[in-house]
């Protein structure tokens, strides 16, 4: 729950900026949709490679809290830079740095959630966390909307709000989140189980030596990547990620079609995140009961439907609201569920690295998807680009469902 509060504050900070980024790049800076595609690609994938590094550092040190703290702190520092940045190169550099911070913190944070949760309820635990996380993601754009409504072109005000929330998030992590040691806890469970059954100590036991607990746990190994179930998860995550374009494109398409005022633009993020917040926990429980792999894959049908709504010729609030509901439901069915699914397939001593690897594959794929979709929009137009993305998802979902048909989680 405390980690949820940290994520709530951090998402207020990050999503307040994300909500105005499409307009800031295309309207305030006067750049093209291709340039926004590059920036959105950086948002999606700049921290991708360090997600594995963050997970690896978490597993090696057995200190996920402090590895996560580095990532949260790095993102907070970029909020200061936003107050002084001008032009695309500076904005892009800060976006990259912020995403690196997110990449460093995400896998250790999810490893902490998995370490503190009942293994049978991983989906629910991640769902509750994502609900709090998404509450912040809804409040951030709402604050951005209020700021832009009160002060037209008041982007600096949004950046100040973002900085304050980021500082509070780092403080909550450092002061309130327990310093869990997942590898040590897993070893202790095994050791005590053997003792309770009258069995000898496990091979290589060092618990009675000075500093013995710090030496516990199996040597780190990348062997989990050779397991068939893990490989299939990574393949599916990459394939579906390649067909997931940034939300900003969907929102720009809705605005382009309906022509509503720019001040209302951040509320599109609020709508999506409000639906995600309401559905994250119940969908997580549903995934625990009926299969996380099934929910992950078939959740992308909702994304295809959202693209179709944005491409449809029907104007007005109804199709916009339906598109936002579908997007929010898609994230509820996929975001935390991927981490829960990966956590259930690997041992505790490599859990952070495994989660980071899955998230890296997804992030790199989405980075390529956003950059490619920007070019496709420019070449083929908004409507055709969205219909192509819809058709590709309709084909890919059954293929991915077949690949994960025997998933143990």
For the regions a language model picked out, list residue spans one by one.
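Juxtamembrane intracellular "pre-TM" segments in multi-pass secondary transporters
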Residues: 1, 179-239
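Helix-loop boundary and gating motifs at the non-cytosolic
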Residues: 1-47, 230-268
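Transmembrane alpha-helix termini and helix-breaking/packing motifs in multi-pass membrane transporters
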Residues: 23-28, 139-157, 368-384
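Helix-to-loop junctions at the C-terminal end of transmembrane segments
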Residues: 50-63, 148, 279-292, 377-378
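Structural signature of the two symmetry-related core transmembrane helices
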Residues: 66-80, 163, 294-309, 390
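Cytoplasmic helix-loop-helix junction between adjacent transmembrane helices
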Residues: 94-135
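C-terminal membrane-cytosol helix-exit motif in multi-pass small-molecule transporters
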Residues: 164-191, 396-404
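C-terminal transmembrane helical hairpin of 12-TM major facilitator-type secondary transporters
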Residues: 293-338
């Amino acid at each position: 729950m405390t980690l949820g509060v940290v994520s709530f504050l951090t998402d207020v900070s990050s999503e307040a900026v994300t909500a105005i980024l499409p307009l800031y790049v295309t309207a305030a800076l006067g750049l093209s949709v291709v340039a926004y595609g590059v920036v959105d690609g950086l948002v999606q994938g700049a921290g991708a490679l360090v997600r594995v590094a963050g997970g690896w550092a978490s597993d090696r040190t057995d200190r996920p809290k402090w590895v996560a703290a580095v990532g949260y702190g790095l993102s907070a520092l970029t909020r200061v830079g936003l107050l002084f940045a001008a032009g695309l190169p500076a904005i892009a550099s800060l976006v990259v740095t912020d995403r690196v911070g997110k990449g460093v913190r995400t896998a250790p944070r999810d490893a902490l959630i998995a370490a503190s949760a009942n293994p049978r309820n991983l989906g629910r635990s991640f769902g509750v966390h994502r609900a709090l996380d998404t509450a912040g993601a809804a409040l951030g754009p709402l604050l951005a909307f209020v700021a832009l409504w009160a002060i037209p072109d008041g982007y600096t005000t949004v950046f100040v709000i973002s900085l304050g929330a980021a500082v509070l998030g780092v403080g909550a992590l450092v002061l309130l989140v327990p310093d869990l040691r997942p590898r040590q806890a897993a070893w202790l469970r095994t050791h005590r189980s053997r003792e309770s059954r009258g069995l000898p100590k496990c091979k290589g036991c060092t618990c009675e030596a000075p500093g013995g607990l710090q030496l516990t746990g199996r040597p780190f190994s990348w062997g989990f990547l050779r397991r068939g179930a893990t490989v299939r998860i990574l393949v599916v995550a990459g394939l579906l990620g390649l067909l997931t374009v940034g939300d900003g494109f969907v929102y720009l398409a809705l605005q382009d079609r309906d022509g509503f005022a720019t001040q209302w633009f951040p509320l599109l993020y609020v709508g999506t995140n409000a639906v995600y917040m309401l559905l994250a926990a119940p969908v997580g429980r549903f995934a625990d009961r009926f299969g996380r792999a099934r929910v992950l894959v078939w959740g992308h049908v909702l994304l295809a439907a959202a693209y179709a709504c944005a491409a449809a010729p029907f104007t007005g609030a109804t199709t916009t609201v339906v598109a936002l509901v579908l997007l929010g439901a898609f994230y509820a069915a996929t975001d935390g569920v991927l981490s829960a699914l990966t956590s259930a397939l690997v041992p505790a001593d490599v859990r952070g690295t495994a989660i980071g690897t899955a998230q890296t594959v997804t992030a790199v794929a989405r980075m390529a998807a956003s950059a490619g979709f920007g070019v496709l929009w420019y070449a083929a137009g908004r409507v055709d680009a969205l219909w192509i993305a819809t058709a590709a998802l309709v084909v890919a979902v059954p293929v991915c469902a077949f690949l994960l048909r025997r998933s143990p989680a």
